[in-house]
């Protein structure tokens, strides 16, 4: 199975400025993400950035880079520009790996690519079991509900599924979305033609527009650890501690 990994790597970050260049035991954060991706089964890994500083650092550790516009509003639109610049075939499988996921296991990247390749759905993504009630109630933790065929029914920042009777509360039914996606190049291009749904506008979740347009998203529990993503300083501290 052939697939490419594209890592959107935006320089600006309001909560942790220049986070992708933060040092983690002698390496910039983006390099850790890249190394995990290069150790997957991907044919190639491309870092899509909007900043010369990231491009220079990435080139120094041997990465293939593609400069993109600084005004993209999502990683998906940044990836679409890469597809155009590099003239990537419409049927190629693309895995979108966020640049701030330095502990993402390579096997998880392979899993989501394979799930798309063996499914009739247009997107594949992953989830993890929610382990405590605080996480279940946290609006920063995106929840997903899916059917027995792995088809996403809804994504929400709200606590879903809702347990009408307190005695029925069961974390085994609760899953958080993991923000890694696989899709074919043609679908990324088509996504950019979609108008944002009302659900995306209120929840700030772009995958809701995909569901609203009638496309299917395959969801499966991740086969291995996802680790800490880095949004704020305490996340970076956790990564440094775990990798020490």
From Swiss-Prot:
Recorded catalytic activity of this chain's protein: 3-deoxy-alpha-D-manno-oct-2-ulosonate + CTP = CMP-3-deoxy-beta-D-manno-octulosonate + diphosphate
Q: Read off the Pfam families from this record.
A: CTP_transf_3 (PF02348)
Query: What GO terms in the biological process aspect are recorded for it?
Result: CMP-keto-3-deoxy-D-manno-octulosonic acid biosynthetic process; lipopolysaccharide biosynthetic process
The GO terms describing molecular function are: 3-deoxy-manno-octulosonate cytidylyltransferase activity
Q: In which pathway does it act?
A: Nucleotide-sugar biosynthesis; CMP-3-deoxy-D-manno-octulosonate biosynthesis; CMP-3-deoxy-D-manno-octulosonate from 3-deoxy-D-manno-octulosonate and CTP: step 1/1; Bacterial outer membrane biogenesis; lipopolysaccharide biosynthesis
Q: Which CDD domains match?
A: CMP-KDO-Synthetase (cd02517)
Name the InterPro entries on file.
Cytidylyl_trans, KdsB, Nucleotide-diphossugar_trans
Annotated family: Belongs to the KdsB family.
State the function annotated in the UniProt record. Activates KDO (a required 8-carbon sugar) for incorporation into bacterial lipopolysaccharide in Gram-negative bacteria.
Q: Which PANTHER family match?
A: 3-DEOXY-MANNO-OCTULOSONATE CYTIDYLYLTRANSFERASE, 3-DEOXY-MANNO-OCTULOSONATE CYTIDYLYLTRANSFERASE, MITOCHONDRIAL
Q: What is this protein called in UniProt?
A: 3-deoxy-manno-octulosonate cytidylyltransferase
């Amino acid at each position: 199975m052939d697939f490419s990994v594209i890592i959107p790597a935006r320089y600006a970050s309001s909560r942790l400025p220049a986070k992708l260049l933060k040092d983690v035991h002698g390496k910039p954060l983006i390099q850790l993400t890249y190394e995990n991706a290069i150790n997957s089964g991907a044919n190639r890994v491309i870092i899509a950035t909007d900043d010369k500083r990231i491009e220079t650092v990435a080139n120094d550790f041997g990465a293939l880079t593609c400069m993109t516009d600084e005004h993209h509003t999502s990683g998906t639109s940044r990836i679409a520009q890469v597809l155009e610049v590099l003239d990537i075939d419409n049927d190629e499988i693309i895995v979108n790996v966020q640049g701030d996921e330095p502990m993402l296991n390579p096997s998880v990247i392979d899993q989501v690519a394979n799930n798309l390749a063996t499914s009739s759905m247009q997107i594949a993504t992953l989830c993890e079991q929610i382990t405590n009630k605080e996480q279940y109630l946290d609006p920063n933790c995106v929840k997903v509900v899916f059917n027995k065929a792995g088809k996403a029914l809804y994504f929400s920042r709200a606590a879903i599924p809702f347990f009408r009777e307190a005695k029925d509360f069961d974390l085994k039914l609760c899953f958080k979305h993991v923000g890694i996606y696989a899709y074919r190049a043609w679908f990324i291009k088509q996504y950019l033609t979609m108008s944002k749904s009302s659900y995306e506008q209120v929840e700030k979740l772009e995958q809701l527009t995909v569901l609203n347009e009638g496309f299917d998203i395959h969801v499966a529990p991740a086969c291995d650890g996802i680790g800490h993503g880095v949004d704020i300083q305490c996340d970076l501290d956790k990564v440094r501690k775990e990798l020490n």
